[in-house]
């Protein structure tokens, strides 16, 4: 049944726009150029407002997810990478449940990727319709059918651009993937802005700067009591403070430290005697994939809950899923969950709220650890990184594990890879929870994604440098 399903959608995949694989080896300088162009297009789309919207001043229902989903409210990048990640989540769950079986052949892999792209486009249309019909840009009846359709078309075209930009990098024209690049850019932009933002905010304590570092100098310059000013700069509420910034730097350091944890399996050439090497299995075997998929799951749950709350507020089942409240304290207006399932799956705002509602914290910890471990373990089966896939790759390279025959390699790799995937996912979830509880800027999930993505780019740079021989030859 599984292969039949992929065969059914094969004709639809054939008509989808596709980036062709490069016919020659792309030089590092060209990859940097294409990556920069991709990032430039994305940033431009983040600044172009949607034409036809009546209002976007209401409380932002997806404020908490925007940093992670690389989206920007009221612009062409309203949906961000959400459709791509959601389609990946759905396809992974279907493959993990054996509803869809992905074969080992390149044809099956290509068909699976095509199906993922098709679902991504369908989800883009679905999310665009939901955003418009729930009144995010104004009352649909007042805007009229023509304007509503125009907004949906704009969001669909922007979603298609994101899909193609991601595919451009994935096919080897650029560095890394579009999803990773957009997420890291958005998160780093948020951290820098909240540290150095010159925007002023009127609070009960008077006019203050949003940026934590600028606020420090402003408070020390304007307050007569310097000790109190220093305390306020470190611990002020509802705006970024220095403790948030220190927590962010601390989490960066911890994640980089954990990146070095790995097990090196000794391998040797089956053709040439005396040629030895190692195959590294990292603690973060699936990298940031678990946290991206977990974010997609929560993001879509938020969308459904918000949509139902708007239409059926007061319904018992809707309230069980999530109840929402608006706030504009210390920043832009935003909606946040105050009850129901969405509340318990959202991170506590600070360590103080953990002590106030420990049940919320415990449920959140269990959900984060469990979901990240689950997604990490199932991802290896559909991404070509399971023990069977690794053994096949080593065999193709005519390499075998020292002390093991070819037939026993899969069994030996199975001792390490599934464990590394599950435990690595567990650690990713744990680090994200720690960052949330410490109050790191950009959310624990965001910080974790930023660090792992930046580290991936560092590894790409080191790999390219080792192939060329020097940094000068690499860039010039």
UniProtKB/Swiss-Prot annotation:
SUPFAM superfamilies: Preprotein translocase SecY subunit. One of its GO terms (biological process) is pronephros development. The chain crosses the membrane at residues 34-53, 77-96, 118-138, 145-165, 173-193, 241-261, 289-309, 355-375, 421-441, 446-462. It is a multi-pass membrane protein. Residues 2-33, 97-117, 166-172, 262-288, 376-420, 463-476 are cytoplasmic. GO terms for cellular component: Sec61 translocon complex. The keyword Transmembrane applies. It is found in: Endoplasmic reticulum membrane. It comes from the Eukaryota. Residues 54-76, 139-144, 194-240, 310-354, 442-445 are lumenal. GO terms for molecular function: protein transmembrane transporter activity; ribosome binding; signal sequence binding. InterPro entries: SecY/SEC61-alpha, SecY_CS, SecY_dom_sf, Translocon_Sec61/SecY_plug_dom. It holds the Pfam family Plug_translocon. Its main location: endoplasmic reticulum. Keywords: Endoplasmic reticulum, Membrane, Protein transport, Translocation, Transmembrane, Transmembrane helix, Transport. Belongs to the SecY/SEC61-alpha family. Component of SEC61 channel-forming translocon complex that mediates transport of signal peptide-containing precursor polypeptides across the endoplasmic reticulum (ER). Forms a ribosome receptor and a gated pore in the ER membrane, both functions required for cotranslational translocation of nascent polypeptides. NCBIfam families: 3a0501s007, PRK08568.1-5. The SEC61 channel-forming translocon complex consists of channel-forming core components SEC61A1, SEC61B and SEC61G and different auxiliary components such as SEC62 and SEC63. This is Protein transport protein Sec61 subunit alpha-like 2.
């Amino acid at each position: 049944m599984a292969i039949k399903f992929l065969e059914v959608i094969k004709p639809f995949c054939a008509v989808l726009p596709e980036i062709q694989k490069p016919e020659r080896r792309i030089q590092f300088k060209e990859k940097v150029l294409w990556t920069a162009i991709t990032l430039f297009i994305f940033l431009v789309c983040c600044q172009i407002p949607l034409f036809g919207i009546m209002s976007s001043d209401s409380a932002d229902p997806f404020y908490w997810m925007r940093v992670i989903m690389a989206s920007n409210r009221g612009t062409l990048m309203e949906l961000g990478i959400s459709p791509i990640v959601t389609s990946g989540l759905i396809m992974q769950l279907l493959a993990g449940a054996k509803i869809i079986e992905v074969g080992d052949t390149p044809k099956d892999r290509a068909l699976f990727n095509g199906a993922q792209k098709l679902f991504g486009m369908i989800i883009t249309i679905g999310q665009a319709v939901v955003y418009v019909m729930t009144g995010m840009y104004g009352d649909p009846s007042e805007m009229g059918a023509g304007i509503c359709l125009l907004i949906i078309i704009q969001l669909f075209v922007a979603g298609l651009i994101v899909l193609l930009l991601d595919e451009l990098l994935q096919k080897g024209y650029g560095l890394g993937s579009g999803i990773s690049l957009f997420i890291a850019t958005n998160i780093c932009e948020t951290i820098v802005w909240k540290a150095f933002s010159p925007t002023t905010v009127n609070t009960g304590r008077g006019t203050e700067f949003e940026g934590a570092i600028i606020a420090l100098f402003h408070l020390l310059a304007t307050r007569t009591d310097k000790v109190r000013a220093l305390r306020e700069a470190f611990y002020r509420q509802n705006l970024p403070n220095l403790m948030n910034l220190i927590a962010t730097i601390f989490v960066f350091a911890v994640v980089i430290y954990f990146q070095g944890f790995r097990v090196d399996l000794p391998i040797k050439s089956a053709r040439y005697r005396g040629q030895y090497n190692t195959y590294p299995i990292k603690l973060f075997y699936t990298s940031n994939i678990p946290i991206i998929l977990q974010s997609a799951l929560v993001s879509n749950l938020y969308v459904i809950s918000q949509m139902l709350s708007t239409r059926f507020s007061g319904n018992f089942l809707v309230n069980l899923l999530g109840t929402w409240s608006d706030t504009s304290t210390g920043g832009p207006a935003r909606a946040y969950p105050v009850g129901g399932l969405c509340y318990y799956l959202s991170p506590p705002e600070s360590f103080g709220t953990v002590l106030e509602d420990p049940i919320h914290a415990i449920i959140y910890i269990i959900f984060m650890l469990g979901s990240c471990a689950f997604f990490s373990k199932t991802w290896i089966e559909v991404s070509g990184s399971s023990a069977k896939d690794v053994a096949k790759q080593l065999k193709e390279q005519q390499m075998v594990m020292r002390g093991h025959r070819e037939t026993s390699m899969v069994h030996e790799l199975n001792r390490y890879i599934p464990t590394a995937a599950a435990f690595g996912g567990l650690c990713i979830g744990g680090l994200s929870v720690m960052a949330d509880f410490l109050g790191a800027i950009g959310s624990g999930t965001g910080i974790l994604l930023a660090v792992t993505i930046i580290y991936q780019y560092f590894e790409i740079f080191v790999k390219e440098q080792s192939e060329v021989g020097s940094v000068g030859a690499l860039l010039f």
